[in-house]
């Protein structure tokens, strides 16, 4: 696969994630869009690491760290959402202002 195809796909995924994150009112949908953004960044890291410096695996190793962070976010995010939905009876972002009591 050519470099341009992978970069266009990554930019497309990143754009979908940003659009969904900005327009989403649901916390679960926002978490899914954040995962799309992280996956697009991982695609860029691996692609540029493979294209520019094939001997050193800096992009691949950094991508593994990003995957670990995404896994932690995927584990903790739904727990936070379920806690908020239990307390506030809603998972809408605009109704979950926890600083105002």
From Swiss-Prot:
Protein family per UniProt: Belongs to the complex I subunit 4L family.
Phosphoprotein listed as a keyword: no
Bilayer-crossing regions: 2-22, 32-52, 61-81
Annotated catalysed reactions: a plastoquinone + NADH + (n+1) H(+)(in) = a plastoquinol + NAD(+) + n H(+)(out); a plastoquinone + NADPH + (n+1) H(+)(in) = a plastoquinol + NADP(+) + n H(+)(out)
Membrane topology: Multi-pass membrane protein
Keyword field: Chloroplast, Membrane, NAD, NADP, Plastid, Plastoquinone, Quinone, Thylakoid, Translocase, Transmembrane, Transmembrane helix, Transport
HAMAP family in the record: NDH1_NuoK
EC category: translocase
Descriptive protein name: NAD(P)H-quinone oxidoreductase subunit 4L, chloroplastic
Compartment list: Plastid, Chloroplast thylakoid membrane
Protein task: NDH shuttles electrons from NAD(P)H:plastoquinone, via FMN and iron-sulfur (Fe-S) centers, to quinones in the photosynthetic chain and possibly in a chloroplast respiratory chain. The immediate electron acceptor for the enzyme in this species is believed to be plastoquinone. Couples the redox reaction to proton translocation, and thus conserves the redox energy in a proton gradient.
E.C. number: 7.1.1.-
Assembly mode: NDH is composed of at least 16 different subunits, 5 of which are encoded in the nucleus.
Superkingdom of the organism of origin: Eukaryota
Keyword Repeat found: no
GO cellular component, one term: chloroplast thylakoid membrane
GO function term, MF aspect, one: quinone binding
One GO term (biological process): ATP synthesis coupled electron transport
């Amino acid at each position: 696969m050519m470099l341009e195809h992978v970069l266009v796909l990554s930019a497309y995924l990143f754009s979908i994630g940003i659009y969904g994150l900005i327009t989403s009112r649901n916390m679960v949908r926002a978490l899914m869009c954040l995962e799309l953004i992280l996956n697009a960044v991982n695609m860029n890291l691996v692609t540029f690491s493979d294209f520019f410096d094939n001997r050193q695996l800096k992009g691949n190793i950094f991508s593994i760290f990003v995957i670990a962070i995404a896994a932690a976010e995927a584990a903790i995010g739904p727990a936070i959402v379920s806690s908020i939905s239990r307390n506030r009876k809603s998972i809408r972002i605009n109704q979950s202002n926890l600083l105002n009591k």
